[in-house]
Design a protein with these regions (language model features):
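Histidine/acidic residue-rich metal-binding segments in metalloenzymes
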Residues: 1-21, 27-53, 65-78, 88-105, ...
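Short acidic/histidine-rich active-site segments
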Residues: 24, 109-114, 159-181
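Aromatic-lined glycan-binding groove of carbohydrate-active enzymes
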Residues: 90-129
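Mid-to-C-terminal alpha-helical segments outside catalytic/metal-binding sites
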Residues: 159-163, 179-234
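Extended hydrophobic/aromatic segments used for targeting, binding, or gating
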Residues: 50-54, 59-67, 76, 96-98, ...
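Outer-membrane beta-barrel pore domains
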Residues: 116-119, 135-139, 172-182, 196, ...
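Active-site environment of divalent metal-dependent phosphoester hydrolases
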Residues: 25-34, 59-62, 114-117, 172-174
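Surface-exposed intrinsically disordered loops and tails
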Residues: 45-46, 62-91, 120-135, 142, ...
Length: 234
């Protein structure tokens, strides 16, 4: 721990060129909790607002605090077929999001279906023979926006959109989203997301534990146009 803290201090020094900010992506919830406490004591309390970064992630909706994430059984969450979002502790909880927002940091949404969606939801969508390719793409976009809206809902302010971007992880993801397998499809994704915001609908799936009404979606846009939100994300 002592050596790790010294390395962090060296990376965040201002006297040897630009700072190298720390990416919290692969930290456990316990590590994140310790890291935030260290940053607060060593920097924030000394009027040095070091921004926090999570380069690529999804969000959980059930465990709201880091302590709850630390205590939860990740294996049970992976086996819970009612999860619409990916509720594993590798993803951010509300406490993470609020701390990152307080730091004026940034969160990138990962484009890996096994990080932004529940264990069973993608298979159900894919195996629905009544869903054509256009509707399937819209269902993928709904999963993406479920993560984004959940984070904005946590911040509960238009400033929540300034916190977010696409953090694709194309160089390391395992299960890409169909229709958007590589960076070459980013313009397609951008257009599909824009179309959803221009004509949004409830985000839900029968038998799953997450839903977002059309009224709530419109509220969480905070008066921003679809085009403005997409520009912020991309």
């Amino acid at each position: 721990k002592g050596m790790g803290e010294e390395v962090i201090k060296l990376l965040l020094k201002k006297t040897n060129g630009p700072r190298i900010l720390i990416d919290i992506k692969h930290m456990s919830p316990k590590c994140r909790k310790d890291f935030y406490a260290f940053i607060k004591i060593e920097y924030w309390n000394k009027n040095d607002r070091v921004p926090l970064i999570c380069s690529h992630t999804g969000v959980v909706s059930k465990s709201r605090s880091l302590d709850a994430l630390i205590q939860q059984d990740d294996d049970n969450e992976l086996l819970d077929d009612s999860n619409y979002l990916h509720e594993n502790s590798i993803n951010l909880c509300a406490e993470d999001i609020l701390i990152i927002a307080e730091s004026n940091g940034i969160i990138g949404l990962q484009l890996d279906e096994k990080r932004i969606a529940g264990n069973n939801i993608i298979d159900i969508i894919k195996n629905n023979e009544e869903v054509d390719s256009t509707e399937l793409r819209r269902q993928y976009v709904k999963v993406i926006f479920a993560n984004l809206f959940e984070m904005v809902k946590t911040v509960n302010s238009v400033s929540g959109w300034d916190l977010l971007c696409i953090g694709s992880d194309y160089d390391g993801l395992v299960n890409h989203l169909d229709f958007y397998p590589t960076s070459a499809e980013m313009p397609v994704l951008r257009n599909d997301m824009l179309e959803f915001l221009q004509d949004p609908e409830e985000i839900s799936q029968p038998g799953f534990n997450y839903s977002l009404s059309l009224i709530e979606i419109r509220r969480l846009m905070f008066g921003l146009t679809a085009e403005t939100i997409i520009e912020k994300l991309f």
